[in-house]
């Protein structure tokens, strides 16, 4: 099944619930999971830790390599990477004859901030508010120009 599903939206906009509720964990490549695996965690002054985005360029390359490995075998794949651009996925889809479907999770910044705090209380990791704001702004700009 040559289908690539790209989940777009800010952090905690509903992607994780969608994946869990539909039992899609085994098909999902997630940038935050790679951040945790790479040890990209920073302690901050508060009781929480943050996922360090400093290595995101390298982790994005790893994510794309993992995706390409799946695509070479024709496997159904889901990307949860908070992407502002879809071009790289379009190129891979064309190369491996995949159909792309994009699900946009359009939660407000306030909703994402509230969910961020709730999740931080559960798991000890918080996404910096500045990153939530930056991601929200980028997604707004890009969504206006995105066509499939």
Where are these regions (language model features)?
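Hydrophobic/aromatic beta-strand patches that form the interior of the parallel beta-sheet core
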Residues: 5, 27-29, 101-103
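Conserved substrate/cofactor phosphate-moiety recognition/catalytic segment
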Residues: 15-75, 111-113
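Generic beta-sheet signal
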Residues: 3-5, 75-79, 100
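Conserved GTP-binding G-domain of TRAFAC-class P-loop NTPases and closely related GTPase folds
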Residues: 2-8, 13, 17, 25-26, ...
